[in-house]
């Protein structure tokens, strides 16, 4: 909620040099700059690029401001000082991202002075709130705010795409889908639209008389989602064909068909990065989502191969090993788990299985290790016995017993989770190691 503006802005002549922190607000035909409350200067982006050299800048959206310079082939020389919109997100005051245009659209007066006054008062308001949370303020000033122009450069640069590879994959997936459709229809015994959930339901539960695993939906058909099909795998060979068909269809429509249309004239795909979409502040991307390119299947890996490096360069892929588990061990002070990670010869999932089943690591079977891997990652996100049973071949009783044994071996993690929940109830929010706030719903 905006409070009544206490600063009125008036246009002034542009000085030769700006001093102190500069507030920058995009205008229809230029940029509004203010280095002191009450007055502002209107200038072109070209001149602003020179005036803002090594100057701390406040903006409602630092990434968008940097992008405006980059789109005009101008250098980004300013120091990212304060991002008003992102500050609101960091403190959990924004349930969803709001652009400056969203806020200004609610105002009856949208003049340039009013736009400046709005950004100024939001800056002052959020800065006071942020300063009450020193750890979060440090995260913002050292990491999040300086990252915004970097993200703008990443978006502007984009990633090189191999159009020929995507064209080949488009054809290959289309051929594969056609063959699978024929095989599915042969198994069922008549022609129908495999992509139609209603027609597929009719084929499985009426024609083949398979036993439904769930009640009928509102449209009067038995559901044929991934969960339901997984439960039917042993009932008929057509189920595996349908699962494979859907995997290929998702790859084709979601990537092979879509990505070529997103290749810009420079031969690159330019995604949009955001720090204010996920509740945790984890970086996300959209149009397209470059962080969710599938790689578990060979066809998925073929999509990844369409992203290439320019001549003389290479793409480097790096990933943390069991990052969430390592954080959990440190946060909970689980010394046994920390010792497992300290020894690079240890396998954390094998060690967990050994502790849960009361056997030596050498006695752990591949199936027991798989169970431990599922629970190691799932338990951090509240996996229930029902969820564990669905993710493995355990029944509900076995899953419940395994979780009990897990927490006997990992009491510190159970105690830490309980402590966090109680703290969230008391404070109304949870906080990460670096101070990121998440409003609690408990």
Task: Map each language-model feature to its residues.
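Conserved RNase H-like, two-metal-ion catalytic cores of nucleic-acid enzymes
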Residues: 1-106, 174, 329
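Helical catalytic core of nucleic-acid polymerases
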Residues: 65-134, 144-157, 197-198, 216-218, ...
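Conserved "right-hand" nucleotidyltransferase catalytic core of DNA-directed polymerases
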Residues: 1-44, 56-57, 115-295, 308, ...
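Conserved small/polar residues in nucleotide/adenosyl-binding loops
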Residues: 2, 440-442
